[in-house]
C-alpha cells in the first residue's frame, strides 16, 4: 500500500486529502500533518 503525507491541514490540504481518498478508494494510506489537532471551516466572505 502506498503512503501519502500531506503537510498542512488548511482548506487546500484537507481538500486534496478528501479528493485523493475518493479517487484511491483505500489503495493508499493518507496522513495529514498540521500544527493543530483539529480543522475549523469558518464561513467564507463574499469577494467584492
UniProtKB/Swiss-Prot annotation:
InterPro entries registered for this protein in UniProt: FAD/NAD-bd_sf, Flavin_halogenase, SQRD
Pfam families named among the record's database cross-references: Trp_halogenase
MF annotations from Gene Ontology: monooxygenase activity
SUPFAM superfamilies attached to this UniProt entry: FAD/NAD(P)-binding domain (SSF51905)
Lineage top rank: taxon: Archaea
Intrachain disulfide bonds: none
Post-translational modification comment from the UniProt entry: The blue color is due to an unidentified non-fluorescent cofactor, covalently bound to it.
Function: Ambineela is a blue protein and has a pI of 8.7.
Subunit structure: Monomer.
Name of the protein described by the UniProt record: Ambineela
Amino acid at each position: 500500500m502506498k503512503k501519502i503525507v500531506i503537510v498542512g491541514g488548511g482548506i487546500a490540504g484537507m481538500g486534496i486529502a478528501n479528493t485523493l481518498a475518493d479517487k484511491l478508494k483505500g489503495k493508499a494510506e493518507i496522513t495529514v500533518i498540521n500544527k493543530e489537532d483539529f480543522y475549523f471551516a469558518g464561513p467564507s466572505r463574499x469577494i467584492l
